[in-house]
Amino acid sequence: MDINDTKFIIDRLAHNTGVFREIFTGISPEYASWRPAEGKWSFLEVVNHIRDEEELDFRERVKAALENREAPAIHPGKWVTEKNYAGRDYISSVANFLLEREHSIEWLRSLKDIDWNSKWTNPQFEMTAYGFLVNWLAHDYLHIRQLNRMNFLYLKEKAGDVSLQYAGDW
């Protein structure tokens, strides 16, 4: 891929809005709070994580790279407890994420004559705006995979003694 592929990346981010919407739809409060194991995140925590990443990480860092400026420090791994993701309302959390994604797509599609090679630098590393954009999409895929795995594990738990081996290897 090269910087001419930004439309493809942005279109995939827009497409993933629908993927996330469908994954998050129809989840009961019990299901939304269920964790696949001790120390693992629930659906509620994942949706709040990707909501904050949407606004405070990826969108902000693409902007910072395009403007050749620093971006505020972030600590996404700590946010789950610091921001009490588990204590939030699931339906509102999903709506907030989808709204932030809509803002991101509108903003990304409004960009014209952009130097996607513009860099964001901090003491740990540097990355181009294009690099952040591609990683944004990769981050979507990481969490789509995570949520699909959580769906499978939830089904496995609820299925009890029924073997899921016929479905294929996980």
Located regions from the model:
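Short, contiguous alpha-helical
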Residues: S33-P76, K119-W170
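Solvent-exposed alpha-helix faces
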Residues: G18, T25, R51-D52, E102, ...
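Alpha-helical bundle segments that constitute or directly flank the non-heme di-iron/ferroxidase center
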Residues: D2-E30, E53-A64
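Acidic/histidine-rich alpha-helical segments that form the ligand environment
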Residues: K78-N117, G131-W136, Q146
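Short acidic/polar alpha-helix capping motifs at helix-coil junctions
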Residues: I9-R12, F24-G26, N68-R69, T81-E82, ...
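Amphipathic, non-membrane alpha-helical segments in soluble helical-bundle scaffolds
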Residues: I3-L13, K40, G87-V94, Y130-L133
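Surface-exposed helix-capping loop/turn segments at secondary-structure junctions
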Residues: T25-S33, R109-N117, L153-K156
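Alpha-helical packing segments of well-folded alpha/beta enzyme cores
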Residues: I9-R12, N16, F20, F58, ...
